Amino acid sequence: MTFSRQMAEWACFPDAIRQNRPITNPAELFRCRSVTELLLACDADRREIGDNGSDYGYFSAFCEALPCLAGNATAESVLHLLRFAFPESPEVSFENRTVFWTYATGKLMEHPCRGGDVLPPGTRYCLCRAEETPATLPKTLLPVLSAESLLPEGRMLPEKWEKETERVLSAFSAAGCEKILFPLSAEYRFVRPDPYHVALTLQKERRTPEEQSLLITQLFRRMCIACKAHNWLLIPDFRCGSQEAVGLLSCFLRTGELPSLCWSTGDVSTRSQLLQFSLHTPEVSLRPVLLRSDAPEETAFSAMQAQVAAQYPAGRTCVSTGYGFPFF
């Protein structure tokens, strides 16, 4: 078994980068939900880093949290981005926060730039919901469609759902999309898709868990077809049971609709059935991904690696830190 640590394949980039807006201060380069969650975990003042807090307060909170975030992949990504954007700046630290801020804002006043201009070279992937406009992304960012955002809320005609799905897929294709993320929650139960029952379910304002699972299965089938047509990679995030995951994959393997897949294992102790399915399905390219966030402690992560290596003795398993921010 060969494990390879790899960068996260999509990211929760801040709006200034996602929308390629003019940058006025360094905090705009990393102020986003995933970083905010980290700062809250380090006991940052919620008022200081909330929506009503100042950008300088946010930057200061990040600097103060650095000792707590030592070795954290997200924090390292932010520091790398700041070093790339301001190569001659002082070191980022709580002691230097005011000096760094003054230097960086001064540079941005002298040389105005947009969010996309400060990204280091190389293509990266940005997770986007269906309602977003991927065309606003900088050219160095390729959109990854978060498929669950295509699930209809309330009543909808099947024709309208298909038309809206096709519109979104076309927009993402035009923006250079190569991958679709498809989360499957612990509540998902495999229900074989049936056009008649799908149409009936779409007419309902409220749906039972089984009816919601039916629509999820139908949407998964639609994403399989799209990925095959565009030669995209489908990335199911299986938080459901192994039996449900294998039932879903087997259904579309039999119909010939299953594309190349890359999936996250989650808790490997409950994944033997899914791992064996991967091992014995050579006609489909299945690549498990271990999420570093599933076992943050090094000892637990090593044990998870060993367990997957024992259950999945062939092929290549990737390891992703998976914290939601880009890793350069």
Residue ranges and their predicted role:
Residues 2-230, 250-259, 263-328:
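Metal-cofactor-binding active-site regions of metalloenzymes
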Residues 245:
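Divalent-cation-assisted or electrostatically stabilized phosphate/pyrophosphate-binding catalytic cores
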Residues 227, 234, 238-240:
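Extended alpha-helical solenoid scaffold regions that build the rod-like backbones
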